[in-house]
Amino acid sequence: NKFNPTFTAETHNFPTGIAPFPGASTGTGGRIRDTISIGKGGSMVAGTAGYCVGKLFTNHYKKMDCHSPEHILLRASDGASDYGNKIGEPLIQGFARDFSTDYNDKHIEWLKPIMFSGGIGVMKNSNTKKDHAKNGMLIIRIGGPAYKIGIGGGSASSKNQSSSDYLSNIMAVQ
């Protein structure tokens, strides 16, 4: 069998800002799900994770009711690697950036972090196309009902975040 490389990527920015460990963990999990669900199934090879945060080593985050960049970097890194490690996907590289500047008498920095999860995988050439269900086949649905947590996450994460309302959309995170 010939193999095809697969490359997947996902961001989990808003959840990682609210709850760094589980936010990054579920970001990695969602990306791994995509890797193994492609076609008739793929296999994981390795992952990467990246983080962009506001200015490091400052105390002004305590006033804004949000996690410090240091806390996000440490806990998100733990979450991303924890998920992959538990199912056999190593993180082989990553990146981290901080950003803060003063421009035209305004302070600008990333309050909402960026959490990037990328993956490399392989898929057998014979698995690239899914089969159609045929009469008489048993079809099984796996999963449960949707819960109220996480509802509205896409719209909440797209809102401008300020220091006064950063955690106000906490129910939008799973």
Q: What is each residue range found by the language model?
A:
Residues 1-174:
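Glycine/proline-enriched, intrinsically flexible loops and inter-domain linkers
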